[in-house]
Amino acid sequence: MSLKRPLSEVDPEIFRAIELETQRQRNTLELIASENVASRAVMEAQGSVLTNKYAEGYPGRRYYGGCEFVDIAEDLAISRAKELFGAGFANVQPHSGAQANTAVYFALLNPGDTIMGMDLAHGGHLTHGSPVNISGRYFKFTFYGVEKETGRINYEKMFSIAFEHKPRMIVAGASAYPRAIDFYKIKEIAAEVGAYLMVDMAHIAGLVAAGLHMSPVPYADVVTTTTHKTLRGPRGGLILCKDAERYGTKINRAVFPGVQGGPLMHVIAAKAVAFKEAMEPGFKEYQRKIVSNARALADALLERGFELVSGGTDNHLILVDLRSKKITGREAQELFDAVGVTVNKNAVPFDPQPPNIASGIRIGTPAVTSRGLNEDDMVQIAEIMDYAIEHRDDRGKLEKARAKVDEICARYPLY
């Protein structure tokens, strides 16, 4: 067996799967709000020899020899993350956002403590207390949500819930909330009831880095995020805080040896590259285009009779309630897949359907904006979506919709 043989020879089945996925990404419009297109530089770092190196511990304090060069990569990732977000502390080792959240819970709380998070059915996340997740099994959760009439967080009601339940931690952030979140107000609520504030900014980290959304770092005790999504890095997690002296050691110990063993040094190097890219002038303009594209897409959908939760968007994400179109989220996801538009079915607040069917879809603009699509293209995408739903039973017309998607993809090649 030779270590130098190419993948196509060693494992043609996996090579074929990668080729097929590459073609899928090239030939479809990616509207899943949590997905993006990593740069060649990020992928080069992630596919480097750093994948060979075990490095349990932290820079300068490893349990293995030969870590002097991976220490350089991790130190760069830490310093860049701190600079990018104005933080006093950063841990770049979490393998995912879920593990970042879990580490924070175990760093600051004891099993059985009460946490208040956003209801999954209203746009929260599994790791914010779902009973099927470790968070909901080890801690007692109470939930806040959105108003039925507005689709927005009611901060006064949020305070009432916090005052009643006296949580030890409040978790802010969401996976399907299209509006700006006021972290200052939530910090006031947390302070009033004596709770820690943890902000999960996984979806909006890129917008925060670009100054297009209020940063939670000055207000939260701890901030977690993924490093992909709007940040456009590798799939991974990150923990930040302002007060390194108060929280740094606790967080480091909770990550390693608490919930993880060896860090993924190739992924950490890719994170460092992504943080550097996010500090370049063009990144802020890219984030502006994400938001302007999302608003253009939202407006175009509204004009075509789609109902949007909260009536629009302030960020990269749109939550579409499809009940007025007489189609479920699952049916729409399958329909749009057929014409080359990738979305995910998603529950809407107060959804009568079960999650595996759902009444809505969640869409977003990070990936299509990375490809270069503009506001005019968003109008065309809305037209395609509306046309596909209207003619969902007409194969010939669905083929026409697919052809329009092919035209757009040809104008904006992937890589």
Curated annotation (Swiss-Prot):
Coiled coil: none annotated. Its main location: cytoplasm. The keyword Transferase applies. Pathway: One-carbon metabolism; tetrahydrofolate interconversion; Amino-acid biosynthesis; glycine biosynthesis; glycine from L-serine: step 1/1. GO terms for cellular component: cytosol. SUPFAM superfamilies: PLP-dependent transferases (SSF53383). Keywords: Amino-acid biosynthesis, Cytoplasm, One-carbon metabolism, Pyridoxal phosphate, Transferase. The modification N6-(pyridoxal phosphate)lysine is found at residue 229. It holds the Pfam family SHMT. PROSITE patterns: SHMT (PS00096). (6S)-5,6,7,8-tetrahydrofolate binds at residues 120, 124-126. Homodimer. NCBIfam families: PRK00011.1. Catalyzes the reversible interconversion of serine and glycine with tetrahydrofolate (THF) serving as the one-carbon carrier. This reaction serves as the major source of one-carbon groups required for the biosynthesis of purines, thymidylate, methionine, and other important biomolecules. Also exhibits THF-independent aldolase activity toward beta-hydroxyamino acids, producing glycine and aldehydes, via a retro-aldol mechanism. Belongs to the SHMT family. This is Serine hydroxymethyltransferase.
